[in-house]
Amino acid sequence: MPRLEDWEIKKYWEIFQGLNPVDNKITGDKASTVLKNSRLKDDQLSQIWDLSDIDSDGKLDFEEFCITMRLIFDLVNGNQQSLPSELPSWLVPASKAHLIQANMAVTTGSNNYQTNNNTITDDDDEDESLSDDFDWYISPTDKSIYETIYDSNSDSYGRVKFDSLTGLYQTLSKVPRSDISSAWNLVNPKSFEAIDKDQVLVFLHILNQRENGKRIPRYVPASLRATFSKDTPSYDLNQAPSKPINSAPVNNKNSFANSYLNKIGHANNATNEKGTDFSATEGTDWEEVRLRRELANLEDLLSKASQKDHTSNKSDDSESAMIKYEYEQLLKYKTNILSELESGSNHNNSKDLGDAKNDIELIENQVTILEEFLNERQNELNKTNEEIRALRT
């Protein structure tokens, strides 16, 4: 059975957007229109929903919606005479492979999950032999190892998917697959398809600690939890990593991933990703929607800055006025870029879109600086007025 083609994913994306998803998910009521139009039997539709709703949250995200549509079309077009009892590996999204494995472990009592005829067998987790003194501190040596693994597996956006580290998992003789999934879920509470650099470093550190006989904790420190629970991953590779929780050094763990690092050498990835790649939607309508929202937020920031300036009872000096003028001109330029993008002239120019997004982030940072500058001037004015009133009394 062929994998999902790019044109097929884009077509499903148009249908998905037409159902007005909330938080990138649609409910059963919204999906029922599409499901019932297929004229399949109710028991078949129910089975399709059960197969597609991998995370069992009663809603379908875009990846799960693609699964639903493909299963429906295979039945309607006669490509399949009946529904499979479980999803084929080529239809399992890479971001949800660990959920499939966990479900199989619950129903079969086994942590074995086979993808593309490659089987990873989990060893028994001997809880009595594990220690509870888990150490969140990442030493410089370990950090260097983690960053090497990250650089070898991250995509062009600085993200790493769960299955892209399969080669590493195979070298961890003391870490069962269930603990690998637990560590991934700890650093990825929002269940994103991929995680950013800070999350990858902590994820690898948890695996390192587990390989050295430390029990994986059930919770992460509050500072890390706030970072990992953000709504949108940060792909800024220049951002400083999270500060260590304590200063205790980690004992000799330099052997972590040595065989894996030797194996990958200078290669970009240890293994090919498993499952369907849904990245075809990047650079299409969804990117335009994001850019449009960013421009709207930028306009709002400029409007607020202008209002604060108007009520400050004093005009900007020449420097701040010039900065504001430059921002407005740059905003106008980026708005024109968006218009061209929507008209189709720049639809396939992902480089220009990336430059526009970077420029928008720069403008937002500069607007923040301008607001802080205006606030400082306002505070100085208020302080001066208070001193004048004090002298008069």
Swiss-Prot record:
Superkingdom of origin organism:
Eukaryota
The molecular function terms of the Gene Ontology recorded here are:
actin binding; calcium ion binding
Question: Where would one find the signal peptide in this protein?
Answer: none
Q: Which UniProt keywords apply?
A: Actin-binding, Calcium, Cell membrane, Coiled coil, Cytoplasm, Cytoskeleton, Endocytosis, Endosome, Membrane, Metal-binding, Repeat
Q: How does it sit in the membrane?
A: Peripheral membrane protein
What does the entry list as the binding residues for Ca(2+)? 53, 55, 57, 59, 64
- The region called Disordered is annotated at 231-251
Pfam name, any one: End3
- What PROSITE patterns does UniProt report for this protein, alphabetically? EF_HAND_1, EF_HAND_2, EH
Ranges where the EF-hand domain occurs: 40-75
Where do the EH domain residues begin and end? 8-98, 142-231
Any one GO CC term of the record: plasma membrane
Q: Determine if Magnesium is one of this entry's keywords.
A: no
Subcellular location per UniProt equals: Cell membrane; Endosome membrane; Cytoplasm, Cytoskeleton, Actin patch
Please provide the Gene Ontology terms (biological process) for this protein: actin filament organization; endocytosis; endosomal transport
Coiled coil residues, start to end: 285-392
> What InterPro entries does the database record attribute to this sequence?
EF-hand-dom_pair, EF_Hand_1_Ca_BS, EF_hand_dom, EH_dom, End3
Quaternary state and partners of this protein?
Answer: Component of the PAN1 actin cytoskeleton-regulatory complex.
Q: Which family does it belong to?
A: Belongs to the END3 family.
What function is annotated for this protein? Answer: Component of the PAN1 actin cytoskeleton-regulatory complex required for the internalization of endosomes during actin-coupled endocytosis. The complex links the site of endocytosis to the cell membrane-associated actin cytoskeleton. Mediates uptake of external molecules and vacuolar degradation of plasma membrane proteins. Plays a role in the proper organization of the cell membrane-associated actin cytoskeleton and promotes its destabilization.
What name does UniProt use for this protein?
Actin cytoskeleton-regulatory complex protein END3
